[in-house]
A protein has these predicted regions:
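Flexible, D/E/H-enriched segments
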Residues: 2-54, 65-164, 175, 195-249
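Short conserved catalytic/interaction loops centered on acidic-Pro-aromatic/His motifs
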Residues: 180, 191-196
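Non-transmembrane, aqueous-exposed alpha-helical and coiled segments at domain scale
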Residues: 167-175, 180
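Beta-strand elements within well-structured catalytic alpha/beta cores of enzymes
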Residues: 54-60, 178-186
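Catalytic metal-binding/acid-base residues of hydrolase active sites
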Residues: 62-64, 188-189
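Histidine- and/or cysteine-centered catalytic micro-motif in compact active-site loops
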Residues: 152-155, 185-189
């Protein structure tokens, strides 16, 4: 008998993980500044519950890798996180989630079949990055969902392989006995503003080009034009998010 198709991909989304979401919770001048984004994440978590999702896969654009595609699928993730990039934004943030080693290994196996160099890891000391931790904080505060994190800051990787990894994820979900959501976590255009102008960059685009490109891609998504939107993403400076989007197409 052939493989039974059992699993369901119930939801896929491009999401933000802007670290000021955590600042938004804290007392001070930035309190409430990202409430809209927080509410949006909570809504995605609500929709996932309504759809019966048991596991969320997150493409994390802050997990930098220089060789192969990597899948963090430990049995459990817990700890206290401070961002080494932005310790003044995210400091001492606690987290506690269950992982899904079986699904992570399925993804790696399916990717290898397609010629992609992919590896699944069930390593307690391999921690999550904030591209995963920020959305899970608001979507998954009660540990309702298992979490699988996939590296998406890929420095030497080919778009064709990223596309194959996306295909492998679809194949793995079909072989998985459960219901899955997939999130591409990261901005479209993503360029930090010059340091001396950091304060003004909190609530504005760094460049007009970035604003126009983002609006163009979102328009294409709304029109259902995935081919053209992928081409736009492929030509933006921020390849990590573009690759994550390519994986989820």
């Amino acid at each position: 008998m052939g493989d039974l198709i059992m699993g369901t991909l119930a939801l896929a989304a491009k999401i933000t993980h802007v670290p000021s979401m955590y600042l938004s919770e804290l007392p001070g001048k930035n309190h409430g500044c990202r409430q809209g984004a927080i509410d949006g994440h909570k809504e995605i978590g609500k929709r996932c519950r309504e759809l019966g999702v048991d596991t969320i896969i997150v493409f994390d654009t802050h997990w930098l890798v220089n060789s192969a595609y990597h899948i963090n699928c430990a049995d459990h993730f817990s700890g206290v996180y401070t961002s080494n990039e932005l310790p003044h934004f995210i400091r001492d943030m606690t987290y506690d989630y269950d992982g899904n080693p079986a699904l992570g290994q399925l993804i790696a196996d399916e990717a290898v079949k397609l010629g992609v160099r992919a590896k699944a890891h069930n390593i307690p000391s391999l921690k999550l990055e904030y591209g995963t931790l920020v959305p899970m904080r608001y979507m998954n505060p009660d540990k309702h969902f298992k979490v699988v994190s996939i590296s998406a800051f890929c420095t030497v990787h080919d778009f064709a392989d990223s596309r194959k990894l996306g295909e492998a994820i679809v194949s793995a979900i079909k072989k998985y006995d459960g219901t899955v959501a997939v999130l591409a976590s990261g901005s479209l255009s993503h360029r930090f503003i010059d340091d001396q102008r950091a304060e003004e960059g909190m609530n504005s685009y760094t460049r007009e080009f970035d604003r126009q490109m983002d609006e163009r891609v979102v328009k294409l998504w709304r029109e259902g034009s995935s081919k053209n939107s992928a081409a736009c993403c492929r030509n933006t400076p921020t390849t990590a998010t573009a690759k994550a989007i390519c994986m989820t197409r």
